[in-house]
Amino acid sequence: MGGRIFPPSAAFFCMKKIRLATRSSPLALVQARMAAEYLGARIPGAEFETVEIKTSGDRRQYWSLEKFGGKGLFTKEIEDALLSGAADIAVHSAKDLPTECPGGLEIAGCLPRDECADTLVMRSGVQVPALIASGSPRRRAQLKKMFPQSVWTEFRGNVHTRLKKLAGGAADASVLSQAGLLRLGIGSFEGVEFRVLKLDLCVPAVGQGIIALQCRSADAPALRPLTHGRTNEAFALERKFLSSLGGGCQSAYAANFDGNVFRIFHEECGFRKIEFPENSGLGERLSEVGKLAAGLAGEASGARG
């Protein structure tokens, strides 16, 4: 979809209202409010309007994300709203973003990262789950080591819907992001129990726990300085790994930068982690991550023969 010609980025801060495009799920709306509060504290006098958009992924609840993939299913219509001028900033769960933006759009930056770990949700009373519901190849590949005898299935829906299905016996366990539960204020839920998984046990998805802000390229220079530098660096490193390795959410690999430690998982190569020196710069770290991804791709190719 083509876009209109927009004024210089300085006009970004002269808008009477800044329109935030977001999905319409309860979690997405919470994240949009978080973005409005964060930006409102940094743009004096700014007012915000939420533009709710149903994406292809929201409309096609019967689709299997494992079969059809997830990258782009939850972002395209939101990006179209930016390009058409119907919105000014898109608020995304960073883990939903493809590695490349459409022409004319950029990821300006991120809000401070929340907890990035996965949470294992078990039906109360279950010790070893016979049936685990997750459509994520990444989660399945890592948790099969914990539960080798379990059968895997998939159910979709927002967080509350999934928890209700689980408590009602649709499965014995599922996996949700810790950040999503925290943002929704869910510390407990009748009929299920929560267990946060250590990062070395289950490496999170690229961008998990991050709220990313996307805008038109002309507005990015004005918006970028307001975003969170440390989180921007983490997201850049994780996306570098993803783009260097290739693939979308159907591929069973993961990357996470936390502290100075970069953790990765590859289904054919296993778990790895490297610790960067405190004084290393982003350019050096990006180079190391690119080399790591290239090495893993070669190792996986060799293993397949």
Q: Where do the model's predicted regions map?
A:
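Nucleotidyltransferase catalytic core that binds NTPs
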Residues: E77-D80, D88-H92, E100-P102, R113, ...
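Structural motif
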Residues: D88-I89, E106, T119, A130-L131, ...
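Small-molecule-sensing regulatory modules
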Residues: K16-K54, R59-R60, K67, R140, ...
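Short glycine-rich anion-binding loops that position phosphate/pyrophosphate groups of nucleotides
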Residues: A94-L97, A179-L181
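Short, structured active-site "lid" loops
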Residues: W63-D88
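A conserved helix-loop-strand patch within extracytoplasmic ligand-binding domains
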Residues: A94-K95, C101-S150, D200
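N-terminal amphipathic/basic-hydrophobic helices that include classical n-h-c signal peptides
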Residues: M1-C14
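Paired acidic/hydrophobic, glycine-rich loop segments that form the ligand-binding mouth/hinge
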Residues: L83-S93, D172-S177
